[in-house]
Amino acid sequence: MPCKDNQFNQRNLSQKILLLSDTHGYVDEKILTYCQQADQVWHAGDIGDPEVMRKIESVAVVRAVYGNIDGREIRNQYPLDERFFVEDVDVWITHIGGYPGRYEPRVREQLKLNPPKLFVSG
């Protein structure tokens, strides 16, 4: 769905972002090549195995959240939600967020109170 915020659409954003989700313990070598070409890699949860993130972090700057299949080690390293700014764009990443009309209750409340410009849900 296209963004309806004209200011956001008309920006000349310069960063290349690679968005991943649901790797479930596997990352293909081709993906690592794309990671090297990105300014940042965002992983929206269900990492599956800490080795996946070690591989990605060895070649890229990473922001990540844990997902519902992730164990203690991953949950200790990554948050449930990641909220940050990139090039003045307010970004919120979470794994289980839902979609318009069917957002998770905790997500729906935050979207009403403090909506980001960009919402990423794994």
Language-model segments: residues:
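Short intrinsically disordered, low-complexity coil segments enriched in acidic
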Residues: 1-2, 120
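N-terminal active-site segment of His-dependent metallophosphoesterases
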Residues: 2-62, 70-93
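Conserved beta-sheet core of the metallophosphoesterase superfamily
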Residues: 63, 99-122
